[in-house]
Amino acid sequence: MLKATIFTSPKREEGISGGSAKWRGNHPPTLSKALFEFLHPKMVADPMCGSGTTGDVAKQMGIACWQGDLHQGFDLLKDEIPVHADLVWVHPPYHDMVVYSGKVWGKEAMPNDLSRYPDYESFIKGLNQAHYNAYQALRPGGHLAILVGDLKRKGKLYPIQRDMTW
């Protein structure tokens, strides 16, 4: 059970598997499992699914899950999530910490790839739009879960979660 805002797991996979550890910036499947056990969603949406960790865990736990990602053709900045969910899970890039389009996947940069936004301010603006769009897919009483970390550049800390619009 998730009992705090800080999650720790000594092993990446403890009786559950998912996604690809080779995908830069992914999260451990035990985090998805703990969140599902805490919230008990019947339907999950993951509009920034990356290698599919959340969907893999949902499937193993018998939870319906819709997944999309920019590398699959779904653009959270302009596309509507096609389901209504009890839990929308968003794990965005941390600005340009890992550049995705044209680097991790694909041959070309994508214009709405948040990891390629030219500056931190425009990244935060785009991130806020993505979160707003994700929120629109929630069922009444649903939860929007956002996994985000801080960014440090040239000795300066950028606390992404503090800078997001709530």
Predicted regions and their residues:
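Class I S-adenosyl-L-methionine-dependent methyltransferase catalytic core
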Residues: 1-166
